[in-house]
Amino acid sequence: MSVTPVACDITTAAGQQQVLQACPTPDILINNAGGPPPGDFRDWDRDAWIKAVDANMLTPIELIKATVDGMIARRFGRIVNITSYSVKMPIDVLCLSNGARSGLTGFIAGLARSVAAHNVTLNNLLPGVFDTDRQKTTVAALASQRGVSLEEARKAKVAAIPARRMGEPAELGDACAWLCSAQAGYVTGQNLLLDGGLYPGTF
């Protein structure tokens, strides 16, 4: 196996072309964009909304559009979008993310069913609180906001999770690998939560 890194702005047509030139006929597509910044929706102008929708909804759709027909022709394809548990459990300060990612979720729900007969699956992974650099930044902001130590802020965040811990990045990778496998061929159009039980609903 060889890995070909491509440094580009994937939200642009030129960036997408660079990626597809490096791998023109992928059997597996994983879309993963960093979340838009938190804040108050009153402070965001139209450009902020367009940027969020472009990165977290339109770019994945463009990449799916460029690759799904080849998957259909080869009768195998796996598409996974890494979004957020906020799709099912919206976070008040992440309205940009809530809106853009929910739009992608709705799009996938329809498309997944239209290509399922060709052994092409489309699913979304919805990670909760994972022990990543981004989470460290979030914990630091929480500590500053509450006037507590980093350790106290981290403990408060973990206490809200029934599993009483943050997720490990490898756990997300394992779940993604399974969705991309032949063994997951009967799973499509789904939103798989990896949140340690944080979401309180039944479906």
Q: Where do the language-model regions lie?
A:
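Alpha-helical segment proximal to the catalytic Tyr-Lys
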Residues: D69, R113-S114, G185
